[in-house]
Amino acid sequence: MSQVYDSLSVPQGFQAAGTYSGLCSSRVKLDVAMIVSRRDCSIVTATSQGLMTQSGKVLLLHNGTALPDGPRGHEISQEVCQAAGKCMDEAPDDIALVASGAKGQYFRPSLLIHSLKTLTAGLGTDSQPLEAVLDNAGDVTAYQVALSSGTPGCSLSGVAADGTADSDGLCVIMTDAQAGSAVIEGALAQAKAAIDTENFTFIVMANGMAGNAEITAEGADFTAFMQALNTVTVHLCRAIAGDGEGA
């Protein structure tokens, strides 16, 4: 099936790239993405197992094979993040690894590590490589909104794709608004409550490059941020479901 990807620019301060690592033998499309922020950003990952939060500059996202549970998964994450840090001259703690896909499969971190130079060389402001990595069956969709109220110049860009019988759906949202992990968690929880997000993994990154005052858990700015995140999330998930309504 031929898939034509939307031409969507990522928010300011972000760059993205994608390549094929070969980690998942059943996947012939691009399977690993890199998103880099020019400055530290809040990274919130919400899965069916719970929430993970961290501050950093780099996200590595593999679609195809899930990390093993337990200590081995932690060891792989450390190994890949250390290699990425060395490749990019960043601290390993500033790098996040998310791997979504079939569980119980053999996971070769060396294949992700060998992809790092290709990813860093391909970084750009187009979302198409990220969309290609998320794509499972021609179902990928992208959407972008601008924030209103007291956050002029801020935007949110989202890319999502449905899951398969073996793996969760994926939704990645980037924003140049300045928002901490707690604010993102609160806004994301309200957005997820509006739709069926079971078996979906959400990743939200906020880098503050728009220069707005930090959004707190109360007030008009938080309301605008929550509404924007809700709009993007609902639009993407409904588009995947095929009802054509968006938000």
Question: What is the predicted role of each segment?
Answer:
Residues M1-A247:
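A structural signal for small-residue-enriched, beta-sheet-centric alpha/beta enzyme cores
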